[in-house]
């Protein structure tokens, strides 16, 4: 299985192959430059745990925003609208994200752009295809990358 992908301006490395866990969970290390923000979205079929290894990541929800620093984590239950934003001033933010049951790692293998880790591709996101594939695992995209909730 290929395990290194780019999506929405961040490099994702699938650490735990979901097929090796009987689809119980998958884990992804995400590396983001300052200012990179996901589209607002909902995971309808799985939970997400975001753990900051290095840098800072802000989790935006309808209840407000919380900034996480090295060693801190945030649990996102199924159905919670959210987006993630790398809010450090410089350098790379590294997070470990665990999805249970497996979900996002599967989506990355279907949709992520294959590219060497340190060479970001020129991404041309086919949002219609992304929404179709993410919808198959229960995800709902609520707006464009960088959009607000």
What are these regions (language model features)?
Residues 14, 27-29, 49, 65, ...:
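Conserved hydrophobic/aromatic beta-strand scaffold that supports enzyme active sites
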Residues 11, 56-58, 65, 81:
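Structural motif
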Residues 45-57, 62:
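Glycine- and acidic-residue-biased ligand/ion/polar-headgroup-sensing regions
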Residues 2-40, 46, 98:
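A short glycine-rich, His/Asp/Glu-containing loop-to-beta-strand
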Residues 20, 63-81:
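Short acidic-glycine-tyrosine-enriched beta hairpin
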């Amino acid at each position: 299985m290929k395990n290194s992908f780019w999506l929405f301006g961040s490099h994702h490395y699938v650490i735990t192959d979901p097929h090796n866990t009987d689809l119980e969970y998958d884990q992804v290390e995400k590396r983001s430059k300052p200012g990179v923000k996901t589209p607002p979205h909902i995971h309808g079929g799985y939970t997400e745990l975001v753990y900051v290894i290095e840098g800072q990541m802000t989790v935006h929800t309808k209840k407000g925003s919380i900034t996480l620093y090295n060693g801190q984590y945030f649990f996102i239950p199924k159905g919670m609208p959210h987006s993630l934003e790398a809010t450090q001033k410089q350098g790379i933010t590294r997070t470990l994200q665990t999805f249970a049951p497996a979900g996002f790692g599967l989506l990355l293998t279907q949709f992520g752009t294959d590219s060497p880790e340190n060479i970001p591709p020129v991404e041309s996101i086919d949002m219609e295809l992304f929404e179709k594939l993410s919808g198959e695992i229960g995800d709902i995209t609520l707006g464009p990358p960088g959009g607000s909730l």
